[in-house]
Amino acid sequence: MRIGVGVIFTYIGLVIFLTGVNVGFMPIGYKLGVALAEMNPYIVTGLGLLMGVLVVLAEPAIHVLNQQVEEITQGYITRRSMLAGLCIGVGAAIALSMVRIIFDFSLAYYIIPGYFISLALSLFVPPVYTAIAFDSGGVASGPMTSVFILPFAIGVCVGVQGEAAVLRDAFGVVALVAMAPLITIQLLGFRAIVHNHIQEKRAMKRILDAADQQIINFM
């Protein structure tokens, strides 16, 4: 009975979501991209950064993932740090996508160094950060990115380069959004390692200073 009710609610939610996508999100994203690109193409870079932050804040799956990570790690990795890392990563990815559309260069200039950096970081950070980073990449490139950011990027490309360049320059934004958390979340892990190392050095220094003071007092 509960499964049947769940299926019905899921179907109704899917119908409402797809209706909103086709009637609202996709047309608005496309028209907004065209209008802003024709007005001032360079403004879309900063706007892309802002949109990335808003997409992360509006994506329900991201909040679910952040909550699960905080619970499983018992607060070692907080929701706030995860949310900050994803906001920075996704915002930067969309902004860089706008730069690529404006200056018309290959996606490989982002993808190859990006995955090289993410794989290099995986050699140094704790495995939990690498696993969370890859899951975050899949979650961040969810419905909000596909139904609003991608049409927005297509609109920007049409406004800057023309319709002929859409297949060459507009697509790839979702790939960058999926790649960005691989770097930013693992950078959180690298930061945690550096922070722990500094704390250990400070603790050792306090112990040595206390031991030296005891020796001086004894003498």
Which ranges hold each PLM region?
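Transmembrane helix-loop boundary segments of multi-pass membrane transporters
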Residues: 1, 20, 96-119, 132-137, ...
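Alpha-helical transmembrane segments and their helix-start/interface "positive-inside/aromatic belt" motifs
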Residues: 1-10, 175
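Transmembrane alpha-helix boundary signature
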Residues: 16-31, 56-64
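Hydrophobic alpha-helical transmembrane segments in multi-pass integral membrane proteins
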Residues: 19-21, 146-164
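Structural signal for the N-terminal portions of transmembrane helices
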Residues: 40, 161-179
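Alpha-helical transmembrane segments
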Residues: 67-75, 123-137, 196
